[in-house]
Each structure stands twice: as C-alpha cells, then as structure tokens.
Amino acid sequence: MNIMLKGFTKLLLLLLLVFTSFSLQAKPVDWRTTTFDNKEHFLKYMSACILDVNKKLPREQKVSDELVVATAVLESAWGTSRFALEGNNLYGIKTWTRTGPNMLPLENEKANFSVRVFLTKCDSVKEYVRILNNHPAHKDFRTKRLETKNALYLAPFLQNYSELGDEYTKRLVSVILYIRKHYDI
C-alpha cells in the first residue's frame, strides 16, 4: 500500500509539473497588437525586439539596447504617443513621399512630410537601426560605435536625430540613467 501511495504521489507530482510548465511558458510576443500597460512592459517588449533585431546584424552594425530603448522612450513617451499607438512608429520616423502608409501630424496637417506607419512596433525599431546604420547624418555615431558600445558615450553622437541638438543628448542621457537606476534591462 505504501509503495502504491508513493507511486501515485509521484504520478500526481509529474502531472502537476507538466500542466504548470505549460501554463508558465512565456507567450510569444504579438508584435502587431502590442500596447503597453506600464513602463516595465514597454522595456521588456523593447528588449525582446532589439535582441531580435541585433541578432540578425553583423557585429559592427549592432546598436546598444540602451540607446534604442532610450530613443524610443523620448520619441514615443514610453509607447503612448499617437504615432506609436496608431502607426506603430516609436521613433517619429518621417517620410517625404506619400506612397506608403503614413500619418499626418495633427498640429501641422499642411506639413511637407508625414510620419511612417509600420505593421508592427518592432518594424519601427528595425527601421530606426537601419537609419543609424546608413544615413549620412549618423556617420560619426557609426565611427564611434566601433570603439565602444557604451550608451552614455555614444549618446552625444545621436544629436542629429532631433532638431533639439545638444538638448536631445541631455534628455537621452537622462533617460538612460533613469532606466539604469529603476529597471533591470
């Protein structure tokens, strides 16, 4: 009887382990429908996305997770901006052609540009990294990136991404330091 009880107990534990492992497995990220409940959720999403983007790139084209995330925080207000919510555009990436999906800025509907719409938020991350790797305005960034991956050192070389210049660098550094202090990414 005691042996039977031990066998039954082992079977129950095995079944419990199997069923709980199914329910505890991470759900795959649905890149298309993601909205963010809080800053931590935003950071986890961004970390998963940039990991996916960087693993497909040669070493010299990879971009620091912290820079990609901090820029998205600044440009999309933690993923809550209209462009992020309606257009999956975390970086305010503009277009001057109206051939593809795009959005007009509400405050300037007569602008000669529009903001790109992406299928997924992660697609906007891919495009941001592509811009950093190819646009002439970011040549200095690419040169310095070969020397270090330190986000705080590289942040000043992204000042051309915004019309704010040096002020943008200060904000970017501030966001990087805030994330380092409050979150583990």
Where are each of the predicted segments found?
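Bacterial N-terminal signal peptides that target proteins for export
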Residues: 2-12
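Bacterial N-terminal signal peptides
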Residues: 12-20
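Catalytic cores of secreted/periplasmic lytic hydrolases that degrade extracellular macromolecules
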Residues: 22-70, 74-185
